Amino acid sequence: MHSRALVGCAIGVSLAPGVPSRAAPPEQVVIRGRAACLDDAGQRRAAGAACDDHPSGGWALEGEGGALHRLSPEDTRVAMLGDVRVRSHELQIVAWRYDDGRLAIVHLYTVIDGKLHDPYYYCPICAIRTHAPGPCWCCGRPLEFHDPPLEGASGPAP
């Protein structure tokens, strides 16, 4: 009897006007462009300015018309942009766009000769595959970089 009353009360509260509901889920987007390192003000660094592994203003994807799509600094896949073997190519990302405009990468692909490639780092000793460059967190050896093509993929990522 008490459980029915609690369920009824919970339903009534969740449907009551003025009670905020959960935030809408983020929008999934597919964006093609080039990696852009940002300065402290969040602006694209001047042409010719060197991008290091961790630019002070973070990373963005520069899409059509020069639009900057800012990438979330908490996103672990953003570390791949510190590798010139990744950022030197056109990129395609599948990402969640949150209400504040930041993007969280779901998939990151390089575009080479019009075909999508799937970059990653691998330790053959420990059989660890990751999207963050650096030493293997198990054995400490350098990770190998791989960028194989996706079979038959040239358009938006699957």
What are these regions (language model features)?
Residues P25-P55:
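Structural detector for short beta-strands of small beta-barrel domains
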Residues W96-G101:
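Short, charged beta-turn/beta-strand-edge "cap" motif at the junction between a beta-strand
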Residues M1-G8:
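N-terminal export leaders
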Residues A47-L71:
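OB-fold (S1/OB) nucleic-acid-binding surfaces
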Residues V106-P158:
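Cys/His-clustered metal-coordination modules, chiefly Zn-binding fingers
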Residues D75-Q92:
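Short nucleic-acid-contacting surface segments enriched for D/E, G, S/T with interspersed K/R
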Residues V19-A23:
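Sec/Tat signal peptide C-region and signal peptidase I cleavage site
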Residues G8-A16:
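Bacterial N-terminal signal peptides
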